[in-house]
Amino acid sequence: MIGNWNYGTGRRKSSVARVFIKKGSGQITVNGKPVEQYFGRQTSIMIVKQPLFLTNNVEAFDIKVNVHGGGESGQAGAVRHGVTRALIDYDAALKSELSRAGFVTRDAREVERKKVGLHGARRRKQFSKR
């Protein structure tokens, strides 16, 4: 499959996306489904297409994505990161433009773990004076 395809791996929260792009008509498939069908929310679809809009390549590439782990928001962010890396693999001149927009940098924020004796990561038990 890697013949004339360009590849990029994207990660966000606990999601991992493998993105393959090649010159085409602008079709985006995520796990075998059209992007509009896979991501229900319009904001998630917009996040996925952001690097394409920025580089004026909305209908220039066919994109195939395998994504797993996490929820809808994390998966959309992972796909955006993967599309960005695949575009850089296709044309390194796009890197500065994508980097200025902040798409090249991996968002390192993860869920903080729950601690013993607390309700959540930071939420303490209610204090009673008496």
Swiss-Prot record:
The keyword Ribosomal protein applies. GO terms for cellular component: cytosolic small ribosomal subunit. GO terms for biological process: translation. Keywords: Ribonucleoprotein, Ribosomal protein. It holds the Pfam family Ribosomal_S9. One of its GO terms (molecular function) is structural constituent of ribosome. Belongs to the universal ribosomal protein uS9 family. NCBIfam families: PRK00132.1 (NF001099). This is Small ribosomal subunit protein uS9.
